[in-house]
Amino acid sequence: MPADIMEKNSSSPVAATPASVNTTPDKPKTASEHRKSSKPIMEKRRRARINESLSQLKTLILDALKKDSSRHSKLEKADILEMTVKHLRNLQRAQMTAALSTDPSVLGKYRAGFSECMNEVTRFLSTCEGVNTEVRTRLLGHLANCMTQINAMTYPGQAHPALQAPPPPPPSGPGGPQHAPFAPPPPLVPIPGGAAPPPGSAPCKLGSQAGEAAKVFGGFQVVPAPDGQFAFLIPNGAFAHSGPVIPVYTSNSGTSVGPNAVSPSSGSSLTADSMWRPWRN
């Protein structure tokens, strides 16, 4: 009998041990299950927020574009986002145009800032030894292309017609030569024609690259046109008449001066020998 009692007493703690082992991991399982059960609810709420925002965005963009909402009741989410991006870009362009209309120096400041940043990047890449050569070349080429596009930007034609590269000059009508009086400092550009040049002329310094930045010489700005030609931008106060621009076009045969600067007499035209060629200086 005592032996049986001892066996029962010795077996009871062993039998109780599995029960205690099974009860301890219940708390982590409960927390994990709680997170798993709450995840679909969180996802459902997130999708509901996205759909609500897209619905409001759809209403706003259709009102802004003045489109009938009944005809666009089944727009996809991607269509709503694309329409919004296009609308914001148009607003950005309109703001830039308005800024240029009120302050003509905005574009010049933007170009100067971009050029300064590009120079800083170039200096860093030239001194940094850990940059891959291919990456450096691609980055500098990309910045050069961006700089060319920025230099091709012009001011709005309605607000500042004098700041655009003018078209080729049309054939002038009959009449004597007309000269625009203006007096910036030398160097001088001789104006061809029968009469003597005016007291002062626009300083000229033509770049060899079409994408070269516009430069200012003696108060006059030289702007490269996309077709490889150049135009002088003359301030309005430097003219005695209404013509605000004296365009200078470069070509293989020579340089022609716009009609506001020289108007040949009837029955005569400027020959190639009478044209000023900058490469002969």
Curated annotation (Swiss-Prot):
Subcellular locations according to the entry: Nucleus
GO BP field: adenohypophysis development; amacrine cell differentiation; aorta morphogenesis; artery morphogenesis; ascending aorta morphogenesis; BMP signaling pathway; Cajal-Retzius cell differentiation; cardiac neural crest cell development involved in outflow tract morphogenesis
Compositionally biased residues, Polar residues: 255-272
Bridged cysteine pairs (disulfide): none
Domain bHLH: 34-91
Low complexity: compositionally biased ranges: 10-21
Bias-annotated ranges (Basic and acidic residues): 26-35
Annotated region (Disordered), positions in chain: 1-44, 158-206, 255-281
UniProt cross-references to PROSITE patterns, sorted A to Z: BHLH, ORANGE
Tissue and organ expression note: Present in all tissues examined but highest in epithelial cells and in mesoderm-derived tissues such as embryonal muscle cells.
UniProt KW keywords: DNA-binding, Nucleus, Repressor, Transcription, Transcription regulation
Keyword match Nucleus: yes
Biased composition (Pro residues): 164-174, 182-201
One GO cellular component term noted in the UniProt record for this chain: protein-containing complex
GO molecular function: chromatin binding; DNA binding; DNA-binding transcription factor activity, RNA polymerase II-specific; DNA-binding transcription repressor activity; DNA-binding transcription repressor activity, RNA polymerase II-specific; E-box binding; histone deacetylase binding; HLH domain binding
Main location: nucleus
Gene3D superfamilies: 6.10.250.980, Helix-loop-helix DNA-binding domain
A Pfam match: HLH
InterPro entries documented for this protein: bHLH_dom, HES_HEY, HLH_DNA-bd_sf, Orange_dom
Motif window: WRPW motif: 276-279
Record PANTHER family: BASIC HELIX-LOOP-HELIX TRANSCRIPTION FACTOR, HES-RELATED
Biological function: Transcriptional repressor of genes that require a bHLH protein for their transcription. May act as a negative regulator of myogenesis by inhibiting the functions of MYOD1 and ASH1. Binds DNA on N-box motifs: 5'-CACNAG-3' with high affinity and on E-box motifs: 5'-CANNTG-3' with low affinity. May play a role in a functional FA core complex response to DNA cross-link damage, being required for the stability and nuclear localization of FA core complex proteins, as well as for FANCD2 monoubiquitination in response to DNA damage.
Subunit structure: Interacts with SIRT1. Interacts weakly with TLE2. Interacts with HES6. Transcription repression requires formation of a complex with a corepressor protein of the Groucho/TLE family. Interacts (via WPRW motif) with TLE1. Interacts with an FA complex, composed of FANCA, FANCF, FANCG and FANCL, but not of FANCC, nor FANCE.
Domain notes: Has a particular type of basic domain (presence of a helix-interrupting proline) that binds to the N-box (CACNAG), rather than the canonical E-box (CANNTG).
Protein name as annotated: Transcription factor HES-1
